[in-house]
Structure formats: C-alpha cells, structure tokens
Amino acid sequence: MTYVMSLFLLGLVLGLVAVASNPSPYFGALSLVGVAAFGCGVLIWHGGSFLSLVLFLIYLGGMLVVFAYSAALAAEPYPETLGSWPVVSVYFGYFFFVFGILYTNMVLDEEVWWGVSGEMDWDAVFRGDMDGVSLMYSSGGGVLLLGAWVLLLTLLVVLELVRGLGRGALRAV
C-alpha cells in the first residue's frame, strides 16, 4: 500500500514539474489534469473519497474555463510541446532540483521524515469527509450552488469573449 501512495505522490510531483516547465497552454492544461488526478488519488488513499470527488469535479470545471481562455489567447501555429528542447531542459532542471533536495535531506537527516503517522490510531476509524458532506448539504448548500453558478457564468463569459469570426472581444488582440 505504501508503493501505491508513493506512486501517487511521484505522479503529483512530476505533474507539478511539468506545469512549472511552461509548455504551451494546451499541454499545461493536460499536466494540470494529471496533477488533479494524482492529488485526488492521494486523498482517496487517505480515506477522503467524497472530498476528492468533489474537489476533482470542481477543479476540472474551473480548469475548463481557464483552458478555454488561455487556449483562445495563446493560439500558436507551432506550440511548445513537452518534448521540445527548451521545455525538456527546464523540466529536468526542476526534476533534479526537487529530487536533489530530497536526497540531501535523506543523507543529512538519516531518518525517515516522510513517513505517514497516525494511521493505526483511533483517528483512522472516523471519516472526516463524511462530516463535511453533512455540513455541505445542510448549511453549506447555498455556497455550493453559488460556486456552481459562478463557474457556469464564467464559462459563458469566456465562451462569449472568444467567439469566432471577429465578433468576440478578444479576437482583435
């Protein structure tokens, strides 16, 4: 089970490095989807199944708006991919920086500082995200509906701004 959690965390770090290496917005959005998936996998592995589902859906809804906006503003004939030389060099630079810090801390500390603690206590019996579900549907339902409405409104505004044939506000840029 530790190997699966390590795989999720490795995918999370590699996805964050891929986002930070500044590829074209198309590939940056794809990397963000991977980061969201691996981050929600970490939450699921710690028992927050409903919380990870809600975060994944809300995050992907917000990313849809950001992706539509950035793809409309940065339409390039030859986008920088994750395999082009400048992006790969920055990617490996970040990768070796992150794992260099990890290796340095492992050598200097000589102890396992990344271990998960408290998994076998009584805290593992109680499901914290289920308390959040009851609060969300009782007193937090209005905020949930407001968030969904704002995301829908933002999506419609972005789609109106990037409408084709020169009628959109940002096509003249």
From Swiss-Prot:
Pfam families in the cross-refs: Oxidored_q3
EC numbers for this chain: 7.1.1.2
GO cellular component, one term: mitochondrial membrane
Enzyme class: translocase
Matches recorded under Gene3D superfamilies: NADH-ubiquinone/plastoquinone oxidoreductase chain 6, subunit NuoJ
TM annotation in the entry: 1-21, 25-45, 53-73, 82-102, 142-162
InterPro entries named in the record: ComplexI_Subunit6, NADH_UbQ/plastoQ_OxRdtase_su6, Nuo/plastoQ_OxRdtase_6_NuoJ
Compartment(s) where it occurs, according to its Swiss-Prot or TrEMBL record: Mitochondrion membrane
Keywords on record: Electron transport, Membrane, Mitochondrion, NAD, Respiratory chain, Translocase, Transmembrane, Transmembrane helix, Transport, Ubiquinone
Catalytic reaction list: a ubiquinone + NADH + 5 H(+)(in) = a ubiquinol + NAD(+) + 4 H(+)(out)
GO molecular function, one term: NADH dehydrogenase (ubiquinone) activity
Source domain of life: Eukaryota
Chief localisation class: mitochondrion
Membrane disposition: Multi-pass membrane protein
Family from the record: Belongs to the complex I subunit 6 family.
Function field: Core subunit of the mitochondrial membrane respiratory chain NADH dehydrogenase (Complex I) that is believed to belong to the minimal assembly required for catalysis. Complex I functions in the transfer of electrons from NADH to the respiratory chain. The immediate electron acceptor for the enzyme is believed to be ubiquinone.
Identification of the protein by name: NADH-ubiquinone oxidoreductase chain 6
Organism whose genome encodes this protein: Tetraodon nigroviridis (Spotted green pufferfish)
The encoding gene: MT-ND6
